[in-house]
Regions:
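Short, aromatic- and glycine-rich surface loops/edge beta-strands on solvent-exposed regions
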Residues: 7-17
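Short acidic/polar inter-strand loop motif in beta-rich domains
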Residues: 16-24
Length: 194
């Protein structure tokens, strides 16, 4: 396990072995071969945390979109082809969600070779940026900050669209499903036999 910290003085560190705990003071010092000051290492750490937070925001949005898509598909199975209004509303909602999802991640890349045919999206760019920023024990370059700002803007635009969908489209869809009196449970009839 690797833990990344900047040089500092901590209060204590605790180790537990076979039920017995040991506590000792700990001071984290920089590699003496480095000429980088602690302020530069702190800048690096701070940018890496910001990148991590944007990747987390992206991933959480994708998880919510995919979960909602599964729920829409479940409702579609319950209503069958008879209820065109619910089916069409679900398709419309899914189309909006897909636009956001495809802006944040590359949904068509399945194998490692697929990135040759389908360009990577914001999430992959953020992950690559974290590799660049962490590749040297120094403050991030101005270009790293600029790329982060550009990518963050793209993530924030998409998450704002997502929040708007959650605030308006999802309640409208739920109201339509309620109005159409879609059954919560439906017994599937056997396909044959007696």
């Amino acid at each position: 396990m690797t833990v990344s910290v900047t040089p500092c003085c901590c209060r204590s560190v605790k180790l537990t072995v076979l039920g017995k705990s040991y506590t000792a003071p700990l001071e984290v010092v920089a590699d003496p071969r480095l000429t980088t000051g602690s302020a530069d290492l702190t800048k690096q750490f701070d940018l890496l945390v910001k990148i991590r937070d944007q990747v987390t925001l992206t991933d959480e949005t994708i998880i919510q979109i995919r979960d909602l898509r599964e729920q829409i598909n479940t409702v579609n199975k319950h209503v069958g082809s008879e209820n065109k209004a619910v089916i069409d509303a679900g398709k419309s909602l899914d189309k909006k969600m897909t636009e956001i999802e495809e802006a944040l991640i590359q949904t068509k890349a399945v194998s490692s070779q697929d990135v040759l045919n389908f360009p990577i999206r914001v999430n992959n760019h953020l992950v690559a940026l974290s590799g660049v920023v962490s590749s040297a024990e120094t403050a991030p370059t101005q270009q790293s900050y600029q790329v982060f700002d550009m990518l963050s803007k793209q993530v924030n635009e998409q998450t704002l669209k997502w929040k708007d969908i959650v605030a308006t489209d999802v309640p409208a869809y739920n109201n339509l499903v309620k109005q159409q009196d879609v059954p919560a449970l439906k017994i599937t009839q056997p396909s044959g036999g007696t």
